[in-house]
């Protein structure tokens, strides 16, 4: 049985992943079937705010899930509740205590006094956004509490979002702290809920509920708090009954309209890879290797 890392965590279902024993800021588990990954922020005392170390660990776990051929779905969530006040959070964004003039700074402690002056600041949470966006697997955000600032942007970039009815809270704090997510967190968010709603969320920076997020189209489902992770697992298990190739191509197709040439390249590259499996592509390869003209006669100009 796994260690109980969160009140919503089912220790009988999940097992820690080998090679990830030294994590400080997140937890990383696979379900007993080895097909679903659970990646969770684990700084509940600061509303699961991230620092550079958090992002390093998050990227490492997500990349491991991406490259594991058995994993089909990733559940991204936040452990809790806070030992300080019992509050819940998915992720409240960057830890402002260690934000410098050049980004978020590496620190040995929890305050600015521990900042490592020899290392540049980072904003590599954007690399995590792109990893979630481009991985050919479904990423479900299970939001047990606050999704604010950079945490709000992370739920936006996930493929699906399920939120706690009792504790799910959303707020885009960028304009309050002199920051702005000018990519997926804002422009793609506007695609999801419409320009007027997105501008309201950013410009007014007000808290809004899980139900309001659902009504705007930012959340797929609002469920009782105690059922949040079980619902995410249920959705994941349903997705795992589908064709892996179809899910992969559908995700890239949905992305392509907003991702420009990068999205087109990903979709076209996957299409090319699939085409390599046809007899027609095999004939093209073999004719080249055999130094002869290809024989396309068996292949009709289909319509």
Please provide the spans of the model-predicted regions.
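Charged catalytic carboxylate motif
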Residues: 53, 57, 124, 131, ...
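Crotonase-fold acyl-CoA enzyme core
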Residues: 130-244, 278, 282, 286
